[in-house]
Design a protein with these regions (language model features):
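Short amphipathic helix-loop junctions that connect adjacent transmembrane helices
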Residues: 142-159
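Juxtamembrane intracellular "pre-TM" segments in multi-pass secondary transporters
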Residues: 90-128, 313-317
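Structural signature of the two symmetry-related core transmembrane helices
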Residues: 75, 191-205, 283-286
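A membrane-interface helix-boundary motif in multi-pass transporters
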Residues: 60-76, 154-162, 270-289
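C-terminal ends and interior cores of transmembrane alpha-helices
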Residues: 1-3, 198-211, 297
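Substrate-agnostic recognition of the 12-TM MFS/MFS-like secondary transporter fold
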Residues: 1-63, 74-81, 86-90, 125-146, ...
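Helix-loop junctions on the cytosolic side of multi-pass membrane transporters
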Residues: 67, 74-101, 297-309
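Intrinsic disorder in cytosolic terminal tails and internal cytosolic loops
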Residues: 26-29, 104, 299-332
């Protein structure tokens, strides 16, 4: 089971970066002039709906058959999805180049990722922010079910588990709708990220401090909504900081950084829950999340053009960032 989880995680890390890069390049090449937050927001709405349907259907199927059947169905759906993507997804705004030897390409890829990712301060600080947020977010979601059962006082109230999935899925849908509106309230994207990040930290601390089931439910709604609304804004900002030809690699590297944070953070918080309880583990998680806020501020201090301009417009008319890197380009 552990090996399967590792393989699924690796697949998601690489798949997420490539898909997002494909979307942004295609939008730039087709002359899209709208807000990129709204596009990512719509994608998140679809994800939320799918999560809601999948959670309900998965629970129903598992109850009628076995716990293994939903995993088999997930594998079948992924195979169908890959076939559909292979048939329908074509590169628009990006022309693949013929590669050389594998070792040479890997060295070039690593060098480009370091140069355009870690070598650009605004990108580097944003990636470090993800290290602290990613691990805490995953732990907070999976620990909610036993924590709420504990607060509810009935360890067999399995409907609570479904309630958690429904809350998070609903928050993804609402967050996708709210992201462009929240962004419009601020001149800079980092201002929106600082606000949502700071309030999320406070909400996590309250989730671990309030020993009332219904109050915690309300706080979970706020936390999940803020996390979901900030994601499209962060995606838009990050995409505007990196060139098209390196987009997929750097986005995958960013996803990997968040996963690496989870490797250290999740076991630590799990151990804290074993020793002190779920409530204190959420308070500790809030303290870890608070470490991400200074990195957003450091990224903000770089005054990158992507912090204020529309990313897709930047892809059409490149503007040079503080490190001499074009935020986006349709060249290959």
């Amino acid at each position: 089971m552990a090996i399967v989880s590792v393989l699924i995680g690796l697949g998601f890390t690489f798949f997420s970066g490539a898909t997002e890069a494909w979307l942004v390049d295609a939008l730039g090449a087709t002359g899209f002039k709208g807000e990129l937050e709204s596009v990512f927001g719509r994608g998140q709405i679809v994800t939320g709906v799918a999560m809601l349907v999948g959670s309900v259907a998965g629970g129903f199927i598992a109850q009628r058959t076995s716990l293994g059947v939903p995993f088999v169905l997930r594998g079948v759906i992924l195979i169908v999805m890959f076939a559909v993507a292979f048939k329908l997804m074509h590169d628009v705004g990006f022309t693949p180049r013929k590669g050389g030897k594998l070792s040479t390409e890997l060295r070039a890829l690593s060098s480009a990722t370091l140069q355009h990712g870690w070598g650009v301060p605004a990108v580097k600080w944003l990636m470090l922010e993800g290290v602290f947020v990613g691990g805490v977010g995953i732990y907070a979601f999976y620990a909610l079910q036993p924590y709420l059962l504990e607060l509810y006082g009935d360890p067999h109230a399995y409907q609570v588990a479904g309630l958690v999935a429904a809350i998070v899925a609903g928050a993804q849908i609402c967050g996708g709708v709210a992201a462009p509106r929240i962004r419009s309230l601020f001149h800079r994207r980092t201002s929106a990220l600082l606000m949502t990040g700071s309030v999320s930290v406070a909400t996590l601390a309250l989730i671990g401090s309030v020993n009332n089931f219904y109050a915690v439910i309300g706080l979970i709604v706020v936390w999940a909504l803020l996390s979901s609304a900030s994601r499209p804004i962060r995606q838009t900002y990050l995409n505007g900081l990196i060139p098209s030809r390196e987009r997929a690699s750097i986005l995958s590297f960013d996803s990997m950084m968040a996963s690496l944070g989870g490797v250290g953070v999740q076991p630590t918080l799990g151990r804290a829950a074993d020793v002190w309880g779920y409530g204190p583990s959420y308070v500790i998680g809030a303290a870890v999340s608070a470490l991400s806020v200074p990195f957003i501020f450091l990224s903000r201090k770089q005054n990158a053009p992507a912090d204020t301009i529309e990313v897709v417009e930047a892809a059409v008319e490149p503007q040079v960032g503080p490190a001499g890197i074009e935020p986006a380009t349709t060249e290959s």
